[in-house]
Curated annotation (Swiss-Prot):
Organism this protein belongs to: Hylobates lar
Biased composition (Low complexity): 88-103, 232-254, 334-349, 433-451
Protein's name according to its UniProt entry: Progesterone receptor
Xref: SMART domains: HOLI, ZnF_C4
Chain segments carrying region AF2: 686-932
Zinc finger (NR C4-type): 566-586, 602-626
Residue ranges, annotated region (Modulating, Pro-Rich): 1-565
Amino acid sequence: MTELKAKGPRAPHVAGGPPSPEVGSPLLCRPAAGQFPGSQTSDTLPEVSAIPISLDGLLFPRPCQGQDPSYEKTQDQQSLSDVEGAYSRAEATRGAGGSSSSPPEKESGLLDSVLDTLLAPSGPRQSQPSPPACEVTSSWSLFGPELPEDPPAAPATQGVLSPLMSRSGGKAGDSSGTAAAHKVLPQGLSPSRQLLLPASGSPHWSGAPVKPSPQPAAVEVEEEDGSESEDSAGPLLKGKPRALGGAAAGGAAAVPPGAAAGGVALVPKEDSRFSAPRVALVEQDAPMAPGRSPLATTVMDFIHVPILPLNHALLAARTRQLLEDENYDGGAGAASAFAPPRSSPSASSTPVAVGDFPDCAYPPDVEPKDDAYPLYGDFQPPALKIKEEEEGAEASARTPRSYLVAGANPAAFPDFPLGPPPPLPPRAPPSRPGEAAVTAAPASASVSSASSSGSTLECILYKAEGAPPQQGPFAPPPSKAPGAGGCLPPRDGLPSTAASASAAGAAPALYPALRLNGLPQLGYQAAVLKEGLPQVYPPYLNYLRPDSEASQSPQYSFESLPQKICLICGDEASGCHYGVLTCGSCKVFFKRAMEGQHNYLCAGRNDCIVDKIRRKNCPACRLRKCCQAGMVLGGRKFKKFNKVRVVRALDAVALPQPVGIPNESQVLSQRITFSPGQDIQLIPPLINLLMSIEPDVIYAGHDNTKPDTSSSLLTSLNQLGERQLLSVVKWSKSLPGFRNLHIDDQITLIQYSWMSLMVFGLGWRSYKHVSGQMLYFAPDLILNEQRMKESSFYSLCLTMWQIPQEFVKLQVSQEEFLCMKVLLLLNTIPLEGLRSQTQFEEMRASYIRELIKAIGLRQKGVVSSSQRFYQLTKLLDNLHDLVKQLHLYCLNTFIQSRALSVEFPEMMSEVIAAQLPKILAGMVKPLLFHKK
């Protein structure tokens, strides 16, 4: 052990100057006999005699019960000798100066220097364990009359001095351990206000060699007038943390809960993240928390984060910016930094300063990468969540964790929804409307720190309905928005800067897509305002609904597009060719096969597999599959022809020369004369719309290469009926006015009238294509009279044959046919009526008027138009009896389908089983134009 003696004169230590090794050395030596000079004044002797008594229990705590007496004796002797040696050096310094009576201010300054020397860490005790802290019974005041002036500082000082005195030192040869310890307190700052966090190594001052510190920490101590503590390097600056120890902070962070660091465990391991930030201490005169020791209460009061009056609108904007901007560099404009998560490899080497966000601190949920937190490097990704209120659903789902909660009596609470914070000091009213509004940060905002910046606003906007958060004193007014767990403040409440707008993760502006209760509906997060449109800042952005509800609107719903696959071979489809979604290969094959009049024969049983690889093996099965899918050469031309259609020029014999249009038909049509022998009439808009929605040609998929059998014909007719039923559903959905009816009424009308619509369409095709000489079911299924006789339903064919013959007799026009077809859909209702009976009657009356308009296109005069109307409506009434025969035959065939080997498709089977018995039993009401 090195022994240093002060035999020569030494200059007194000057505040702020380089430390003197002689003054810092008494703790390393053993006192010599007779070292106290005889010229000591009498006023200082009682003060010296009181020092060892009080410091015996304060600096080196007394052992608890059951401790070794020899160890206690050794500790008492060593502490007493150190104190005496320190005092002798101080007196020797005074005697060397040649003056035995110094002014009082010099004596107090020297005493402060001696006391500061006593506070220095002891070097040689590195291997000696510190005894556990026991109860301090001494009532002696360390700093004399200064302590009563600052009552809250006394317990805090006593709670921190014990671990400072017993911490393990550095190496024996490290000069920074003793040189840095000697420091005179600055003028105007009491010793009780200059505090350091517990450290186990030698602090690094400006005059000592600095080693890399694993966990630098700094504590900013503010006086009531705002002054800050100073050291040799100058005052602490906000946002600029300074290292205070080598392995000190690292050792403090590594102490497990319950372990003794000088007898006091300040921060548990799980809460070691709170030892890193630089916090501002504010005096709080509060009683000790019940059930806790004075030392624990002092420590919690020392390291708690107070709630300060802040600009909460700016806090919300800065929080979003730090949580969402992954490229934020944290330069001079950085408002705060965040502490690393617990159990992080770099948790002991991150300088953290809590500047403008001291309200509440929450631990992170995700560990960052090891190299994500370089010492004094770029800004680290966000690791803390700052918020004033927490959602109850998310808080209860997580495991409880202990946090340090700000307040007069800080304590450890589990991670449950926090109540309102303590009342804040009175502050000036906000200068802008909505400035006091606080936006709660979502609990999942810190999880996705590496995600894109549009994820927050993207997460607020699209999330499931959750429990509403508890309201804080600065929370926005509650809203009853469906599907939103929280609400956003008004746009005016946030700072009107571009950085704040981008930090919030919201688009610059949104255009109103849909409306909910008269308010603009928020659109997709990537949908921004187009150029030229005015910016929209709705006053209430908190009325949100999930995207699922917005897409359920029948007026704005969009069905998912079908997968582009060829319906023939399964290859990637290139488009809709000849009425079917096919690939280019099948398109060319069908065109060549139909135009070349090839007679393909299948080498197998007409059931070959047609796919992308084997589609060229059997052209017969490929062509059959094309016909079954509904491909037709005239499909495209027929579709274009239906879109734009004009009335055919009538012969001069059929129509007289152009004459004046009667008054009664002037509303129905207009006549434009291009030449003396040709008249072109404009079609009413509704009839023109009916032409555009007319279904395309549908194929039955019947194999005409095989001989006809009863079962094959019936099966092909059933397949055709299934496709036509789907076509009727699609057509009715496009029918003007039909969607205004109740959904149950729509289904009922289709189920009651699908057979009438099929037979009526059969008669129209037979009339148009073969002039009513045959039954034109489909382009690939045309029955002449010979094939009718060979079938098992010849009598039924004769019944259906009456319809095209009536069309030929009446010379029905396409406009009349389209209006009559809609009236057939509305000709049968249940006995009890429909749910939307009023809308149904209005719709039916409107289409009756359209039929009159269609009649007026050809008939001149009221008498002829009335006769024509009677003939057409009589035909509609006669269809009821004809369709009843079809219903009876269809139900009988359906019941005997297994015996007859007839296949019925699924949808058609459901309609037959559910509705045909009701219709045949008379449980429906046919709407007739004329009485029987």
